[in-house]
């Protein structure tokens, strides 16, 4: 038998790669097996033009259904004469409109070359008795609804969220991004301005301007602090090795420059009197406050703001002398630290009472108790010579040196 008389089995399945060069026959007339897509005959082929079977209608117009898919039809059993008399006559049902089966098909997967009027289940405008529209597939209905939906900007109360990636600097979605891309801010350069919300634009521009002014002030402060030299160690403060030492100590009543380490050593010295320690090492002007700062401050108004911020910061720390009511603070109401009890109640400020000692020392007396005097007397040492003199004086005053009278015989 010649190969041309044998039908190509790959061609029957629509996957023959040889085409006209194939040695076997590509004639469907001589092939007994049918290559017509049975799903196409029912209008349910999801592959469309990519289907390997033929999408053609039979010439006689009959639809071939495979035997395995035919449902068995059960014929009613024959009726006996007695049963035929008992069966009531059939009443014709009112004419109802025949329901037409609608098949949902993907528009992208359906065969584009096939005439829609030839596909079963499809209803054209001419077929409908009342001008019914062509039914859409599920995917087509969704896409059509999305395309015809109204723009969210037309709704006055619709929420419009700005794209977080565009706000950070770059959005890879571009024009296809589902979020709203804002206008670029002239100060920060980011797309953070809402195109429709004027209040949001004003708030952001105000906040951005405040941050810009703070950055400018910080830049000017750094520029003014770069060339400052400590008056004690004669080193540039910003050129010290440790970053923790690159800080200034601002004196409240003096404009001389000192670093953090040098002025701390000066204020902690014990070989000098208190007025000397509190005064400036160079001009001898007494300063009550020494404030640490990362930038050099020379203007008096800036110093006042710095002192106020320093007081507020110290007022949040507990005083180690007061010790939540268990101790006594020698500074009283002038202490910068927090005086509070364990329950959080603030202590009432009281003025410290001062007492000048015999040696010229000053003592702070906040509370006077008898036991304090007893402890002071016991702890105070008395020389032995003074003890002997006190004993002789006591004996003289008591009359112990007088001769006792002679006893009666």
UniProtKB/Swiss-Prot annotation:
A Pfam family assignment: zf-CCCH_2
Tissues of expression: In adult males, highly expressed in testis, small intestine, large intestine, stomach, heart, liver, kidney, lung and muscle. Consistent with its role as a neurogenic inhibitor, expression is much lower in the brain, and also in skin.
Enzyme Commission identifier(s): 2.3.2.27
Enzyme's top EC category: transferase
Membrane-crossing residue ranges in chain numbering: none
Zn-finger segments (C3H1-type): 2-29, 31-58, 157-184, 313-342
Cellular localization per UniProt: Cytoplasm; Nucleus
InterPro entries, alphabetized: MKRN-like (IPR045072), Znf-CCCH_4 (IPR041367), Znf-RING_euk (IPR027370), Znf_CCCH (IPR000571), Znf_CCCH_sf (IPR036855), Znf_RING (IPR001841), Znf_RING/FYVE/PHD (IPR013083), Znf_RING_CS (IPR017907)
Record Gene3D superfamilies: Zinc finger, CCCH-type, Zinc/RING finger domain, C3HC4 (zinc finger)
One MF term in the entry's GO annotations: zinc ion binding
Zinc finger (RING-type): 230-284
Catalytic activity: S-ubiquitinyl-[E2 ubiquitin-conjugating enzyme]-L-cysteine + [acceptor protein]-L-lysine = [E2 ubiquitin-conjugating enzyme]-L-cysteine + N(6)-ubiquitinyl-[acceptor protein]-L-lysine
PANTHER family to which the protein is assigned, alphabetical: E3 UBIQUITIN-PROTEIN LIGASE MAKORIN-2, MAKORIN-RELATED
Name this polypeptide is given: E3 ubiquitin-protein ligase makorin-2
